[in-house]
UniProtKB/Swiss-Prot annotation:
Keywords: Annexin, Calcium, Calcium/phospholipid-binding, Cell membrane, Cytoplasmic vesicle, Lipoprotein, Membrane, Myristate, Repeat. This is Annexin A13. It is a lipid-anchor. A pair of annexin repeats may form one binding site for calcium and phospholipid. It comes from the Eukaryota. Detected on the tips of microvilli in small intestine (at protein level). It holds the Pfam family Annexin. A lipid is attached at G2 (N-myristoyl glycine). Annexin repeats lie at residues 15-86, 87-158, 170-242, 246-317. InterPro entries: Annexin (IPR001464), Annexin_repeat (IPR018502), Annexin_repeat_CS (IPR018252), Annexin_sf (IPR037104), ANX13 (IPR009166).
Length: 317
């Protein structure tokens, strides 16, 4: 959906990579920077069009647009502009690498990205990771995580979630029973049974399984996971369950959490708005409005400032 909106905008006077490249060149040359022109071009083009603009810029001016913006801009505005110049899967790959490099691992980031993507997105992210860093994403994840979290992430990296649109009622009942036997129905939890179901079944099938579970046990799946698991594994399982139930709602909640209370988690705002822009951002906006009785644009507007605010708000329109 988001794609259609971006497309509509870029066609109101025809997309022209050459003209956009010139506009960006003019915005950055000489003293000072014309931020408004940069915002206008970056926010009104699709990801594919921005790739063409980058190419055109390099041909005409013999420079990488990223390098130019990197030296001209600063702060969160710069981060967002550079994120927009990456293909979404490259950007996700960079975020994963950042989550793992150096001391310590940002498990929450690994979970947010790997537990929310479709097979096709996972495959594209793995390819981008290999291309950008000359390493296998799977072996880096294996090295940087351990125990049951490692198992579920590696399962997800196989990109073997069923994508059939039909629901097998019998399988849902069987899976619900297996999940009961693996969790509530025994001492300790058998994570392999959870992984098998959570990483392999389609979202539609999972919803049927959670319903069957509710009927069988009289408890919802989230409650069981809260009781039976802990730490990062719990976070990963809950993320998959929430995404299966309502992917757009899951991202709406993350955005809300990034802004509510004191301080703002700008990194999360950038990551979600940029990566979901051409996937389901319109749906996320609608879900945000429904859940929190306020518009996402308004909340972003009151929680950010300057050119960063202008760029995010432009991306949300």
């Amino acid at each position: 959906m988001g794609n259609r909106h971006a497309k509509e905008r870029s066609h109101h006077h025809g997309f022209d990579a050459d003209r956009d490249a010139k506009k960006l060149y003019k915005a950055c040359k000489g003293m000072g920077t014309d931020e408004a022109a940069i915002i206008e071009v970056l926010s009104s083009r699709t990801s594919e069009e921005r790739q063409q603009i980058k190419q055109k810029y390099k041909e005409k001016y013999g420079k990488d647009l990223e390098e130019v913006l990197n030296s001209e801009l600063s702060g969160n505005f710069k981060k967002t502009a550079l994120a927009l110049l990456d293909r979404p899967n490259e950007y996700a790959a960079r975020q994963l690498q950042k989550a793992m490099k150096g001391v310590g691992t940002d498990e929450a980031m690994l979970i947010e990205i790997l537990c929310t993507r479709s097979n096709k997105e996972i495959v594209a992210i793995k390819e981008a990771y290999q291309r950008l860093f000359g390493r296998s994403l799977e072996s880096d994840v294996k090295e940087d995580t351990s125990g049951n979290l490692r198992k579920i992430l590696v399962s997800l990296l196989q990109a073997s979630r069923d994508e059939e649109d039909t629901v097998d009622k019998e399988l849902a009942g069987q899976d619900a029973k297996d999940l009961y036997d693996a969790g509530e129905g025994r001492w300790g939890t058998d994570e392999l049974a959870f992984n098998e179901v959570l990483a392999k079944r389609s979202y539609k099938q999972l919803r049927a399984t959670f319903q069957a579970y509710q009927i069988l046990i009289g408890k919802d799946m989230e409650e069981t996971i809260e009781e039976e698991t802990s730490g990062d594994l719990k976070k990963a399982y809950l993320t998959i369950v929430r995404c299966a139930q309502d992917l757009e709602g899951y991202f709406a909640d993350l955005l809300y959490k990034a802004m509510k209370g004191m301080g703002t988690d700008e990194e999360t705002l950038i990551r979600i708005i940029v990566t979901r822009a051409e996937v389901d951002l319109q749906g996320i906006k609608a879900k945000f409005q429904e859940k929190y009785q306020k518009s996402l644009s308004d909340m972003v507007h009151s929680d950010t400032s300057g050119d960063f605010r202008k760029l995010l708000v432009a991306l949300l329109h």
